[in-house]
Swiss-Prot record:
Alphabetical list of Pfam families matching this protein: TsaD
Enzyme Commission numbers on file: 2.3.1.234
Protein name stated in the entry: tRNA N6-adenosine threonylcarbamoyltransferase
Organism classification: Bacteria, Bacillati, Bacillota, Bacilli, Bacillales
Any one GO MF annotation of this record: N(6)-L-threonylcarbamoyladenine synthase activity
Length: 344
């Protein structure tokens, strides 16, 4: 099938790790030919979070339609493709299985190479649509389930030099938003309120100066919930804008200061922002500001909002790198909810 002989490499990406069903056709790992995302936010809203059974059911309903639509928008057939890339893990096992089984079936039926992709590798490679990577580079990955600093010295070589010891930042955002009675997904709502508020509560900045690159957000979450509870006990209703701004200031301070310190220590050429929380305006603005001041020679890459949340273009981009390195998954590949980034 000589995919590598052709000038262009066309990969179909499939993503179903949580509550988005997505498919995308990507050319040469850096050009989006089509990208289709079916979101389930409305279905999970009334539960205040993702319900795994509902997510799986939605994936079953959407997967075929989404793949067909991605091929149609790209104006290609399965025979034009060089391979199929799919999120293998981590994520919700029932959700992952839908995408993995669809990818395995398509690859098998059309005799195409299959490439399993780590979900976080996908988030990092979403930045590949912005510019070429120059190593060494550092990624700040911030999402609902992950908060990590990932050092890369070459394509597909990941070293986690810092990670959360408890809650991920996105998780803390959602829990705090719920306490304030905000709609799901909470991170977006907190970010909006924070714009019009002040950091009047000065919540703790955990592990800010401990010398490590690790994070902790459970103390901040508890402090926020206790402060709100105590104020309400006294019959006071705090300004939600100030509460949101104070919470966000604490998270952003820690994320940005540790990221800048790690980037300096490792002398990176590029600094990448990745993951769902990369859409947060407060975080984006602060990172741009600090990099200008502290790391004038480092290129900061921030993905467009459309590529921050879960999508399949990023999976196809990461999959293309593995594909061109000759990596292949067997047709008996299984969903792996505990897949580690450093093991791929």
């Amino acid at each position: 099938m000589g995919g590598l002989m052709k000038k262009n490499t066309l990969i179909l990406g499939i993503e179903s790790s949580c509550d988005e069903t997505a498919a995308s056709v990507v050319k040469n790992g850096c050009e989006i030919v089509s990208s289709v995302v079916a979101s389930q936010i409305e279905s999970h809203k009334r539960f205040g979070g993702v319900v795994p059974e509902i997510a799986s059911r939605h994936h079953v309903e959407q997967i075929t339609l989404v793949i067909e639509e991605a091929l149609k928008q790209a104006n290609v057939t399965m025979d034009d493709l060089d391979g199929v890339a799919v999120t293998e893990g981590p994520g919700l096992v029932g959700a992952l299985l839908i995408g993995v089984n669809a990818a395995k079936t398509l690859a098998f039926m059309h005799n195409l190479p299959l490439v399993g992709v780590h979900h976080i590798a996908g988030h990092i490679y979403a930045n590949r649509f912005e510019t070429e990577f120059q190593f060494p580079l550092l990624s700040l990955v911030v999402s609902g389930g992950h908060t990590e600093l990932v050092l890369m010295k070459a394509d597909n070589e990941f070293e986690i030099i810092g990670e959360t010891r408890d809650d991920a930042a996105g998780e803390a955002y959602d829990k705090v938003a719920r306490t304030l009675g905000l709609a799901y997904p909470g991170g977006v709502q907190i970010d909006k309120l924070a714009k019009d508020g002040e950091d009047t509560f000065h919540f703790p900045r955990a592990m800010m100066d401990d010398g490590s690159f690790d994070f902790s957000f459970s103390g901040l979450k508890s402090s926020f919930i206790n402060t709100l509870h105590n104020l309400r006990q006294r019959g006071e209703e705090p300004n939600p804008n100030d509460m949101a701004a104070s919470f966000q200031a604490s998270v952003v301070d820690v994320l940005v200061s540790k990221t800048i310190r790690a980037a300096k220590q490792h002398g990176v050429k590029q600094l990448l922002l990745a993951g769902g929380v990369a859409a947060n305006q407060g975080l984006r603005e602060r990172l741009i500001q600090e990099v200008k001041l502290e790391l004038p020679d480092t290129e900061l890459i921030i993905p467009p909002l459309s590529l921050c949340g879960d999508n399949a273009a990023m999976i196809a981009a990461a999959g293309t790198v593995s594909f061109l390195q000759g990596k292949r998954s067997n047709y008996d590949m299984n969903a792996n909810p505990g897949l580690l980034l450093e093991d791929i």
